[in-house]
Each structure stands twice: as structure tokens, then as C-alpha cells.
A protein has these predicted regions:
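Short leucine-rich amphipathic alpha-helices used at interfaces
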Residues: 37-39, 86-87, 146, 160-161, ...
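Generic N-terminal initiation segments characterized by hydrophobic and/or small/turn-forming residues
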Residues: 5-8, 46, 65, 94-95, ...
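Hydrophobic residues within the alpha-helices of tandem HEAT/HEAT-like
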Residues: 27-32, 67-81, 101, 115-123, ...
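HEAT/HEAT-like alpha-solenoid repeats
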Residues: 2-9, 38-52, 79-101, 126-141, ...
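Alpha-helical solenoid scaffolds in large eukaryotic transport, assembly, and signaling factors
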Residues: 10-85, 119-120, 201, 238-242
Length: 291
């Protein structure tokens, strides 16, 4: 009878990537047969995470990522043996898997990306805020690999589709992180931050503001474009209700514009603020942005 230790050892000893996938499936069958508790009680998850962080042996990092990907695919989500799958236990795998995006070994890197691809869709929209916090810590870290930061930014882009409403609720926290990413010295991070900002701003449901999303993102990247953006916005006749996601992007822009030296920009900004305030119907939304 297979034990978890034997299944793990077979995974570590696998002679090829294809062989590793077969042994990883055997491991998931063991977990599904003996219960989710084995992930912790038999230290299966600890073993996978330890090997994922192995500094010397790239093949072990690859095997561990393959194992985690299999657990995400076979012991969680729609394939979970019971309503509660392995998702809560897999949260701690996110930072080391993202770190694997920068692995010098191509096979280990590919396995880490595959595991994250299987893991991210498992998180329900209600868990988006917790997942975002983990991604923020990677993007703003001074020690994280640039590939990990790019990977975290791409995941935020995916969340804009997977958890549309929740990303809208979190825009106030997301935009400063993305702005920091835009100013990274590594061009790949900066470019992805701009793409991600454009994607997440797509959750704004205000049809008056949506055509100006590229301009709003441009202001995050280049503050010197604020006067031109304000000039464009001042020509709008706002009629659509202004909700939280719209304010999350507009308030930082208007705050910056009101500090511009140009009285013309300040005057235009005040007019925009006045027009927006009239269209905020939810007092709870307005209260979030009151000084």
C-alpha cells in the first residue's frame, strides 16, 4: 500500500518531467483517498514547499512545483473530493512559486508558472483581497526577482476577470502598488505595471470616464501629463453615477491636479470635483474619500 512518504520519494526520484507528472498524480490520489488532513498531518505540503525552496537542486524545485500544481488541479477546485478542497492550505505556496518565475533552470521555471496557473483560478472572489495582499508584498519588495514581480502583476490582471467586483472594491489599494511598479528601474516590470493598470481600470463602470482610462493610467506613470488629462476631463458632461472604482482612480488624480501651480488646472479640477460629487449617490462610498 502506497504511503505519502513513498509517493513523495517517487516524485523526487522521477527520471523525467513526464515521469514526475505521473508520480504527482499518484500523490494526489493518496491525498484524496486518505483525506485532506494528510497535507498537514503527514507533512506533504511542508515537504513540497521545502523542496520548492531548495537552492542547490533544480530538478527538486521542478518536481515540487509539479507536485503543487497537481494538488491544485486534483485536490482542489472542481476536482476536490469534498466541498472544501485544498485551497486554504495552498496559499503559502504563492510566494515561493512566484519566486520560481525567476529560476535560471527553464524546467523549474515552467513548472512554477504551471502550478500558479492551476492555483490562481481556485480562489473564490471573496478571497481576492487576501490574494492581492500577497501579490502587493511581492511587487513592492526590494528583494523579489523582477520576474516574480511581473508574474504578480499578470495575476492581478487575471483577477480583474476572475473577481471583477472585488478588484473594483480594492482599486484604492491596487493603484498605489501599480504606480510603484511603473517606476521600477526594470523595464519589464514597468511595462507590465502599465498593462495591468489599464486592465484593472477596466472594472470602472462609469461610461463617462472609461474612454479616458489610457489618460488616467498615463498620469500614474507620468505625473507631468496631469494638466493635459485634466483639460480633457474638464470637457466632459458627467451624467453617469460615480461609484467607488471611479473615485479610486479619480481622487488621486484630482488631488495631484489641485496641487498644480497653474490656476487654470486648479479651476478645471474644482469644476470636475463639483460635477463628480453631484453624481455620488452612495454616502458610504463618498465617506471613504472625505478628508
Amino acid at each position: 500500500m502506497t504511503t505519502s512518504a513513498a509517493a513523495l520519494q517517487s516524485l523526487w526520484d522521477s527520471v523525467s518531467t513526464e515521469d514526475a507528472h505521473r508520480h504527482a498524480e499518484t500523490l494526489t490520489e493518496y491525498i484524496n483517498t486518505n483525506g485532506l488532513r494528510t497535507l498537514l498531518s503527514e507533512r506533504i505540503l511542508d515537504e513540497l514547499l521545502d523542496k520548492l525552496k531548495d537552492k542547490k537542486q533544480a530538478h527538486l524545485r521542478e518536481r515540487a512545483a509539479i507536485g503543487l500544481g497537481a494538488v491544485a488541479s486534483k485536490v482542489a477546485g472542481k476536482n476536490a473530493p469534498m466541498p472544501l478542497g485544498a485551497e486554504p492550505w495552498l496559499v503559502n505556496a504563492i510566494p515561493p512559486l512566484l519566486d520560481g518565475y525567476g529560476d535560471k533552470n527553464e524546467a523549474a521555471k515552467k513548472a512554477a508558472e504551471g502550478a500558479m496557473g492551476a492555483l490562481v483560478p481556485l480562489f473564490p472572489p471573496e478571497a481576492a483581497a487576501e490574494l492581492l495582499e500577497m501579490l502587493y508584498s511581492v511587487i513592492t519588495s526590494g528583494t523579489a526577482k523582477w520576474q516574480a514581480k511581473v508574474g504578480a502583476l499578470k495575476i492581478i490582471s487575471r483577477l480583474a476577470d476572475l473577481a471583477y467586483e472585488q478588484v473594483g472594491d480594492e482599486l484604492t489599494q491596487i493603484t498605489p502598488v501599480l504606480t510603484q511598479g511603473m517606476h521600477e528601474t526594470k523595464a519589464e516590470v514597468s511595462k507590465q505595471a502599465i498593462k495591468t493598470a489599464t486592465k484593472v481600470c477596466g472594472v470602472i463602470d462609469n461610461n463617462d470616464i472609461r474612454p479616458f482610462i489610457p489618460d488616467l493610467v498615463g498620469c500614474m506613470d507620468r505625473p507631468d501629463t496631469v494638466p493635459d488629462c485634466i483639460k480633457k476631463l474638464s470637457s466632459i458632461t458627467f451624467v453617469a453615477e460615480v461609484t467607488g472604482p471611479a473615485l479610486a482612480v479619480m481622487v488621486p488624480l484630482l488631488s495631484r491636479a489641485l496641487n498644480e501651480r497653474s490656476q487654470t488646472v486648479q479651476r478645471q479640477s474644482v469644476i470636475i470635483v463639483d460635477n463628480l460629487c453631484k453624481l455620488v449617490r452612495d454616502p458610504h462610498t463618498a465617506a471613504m474619500y472625505l478628508p
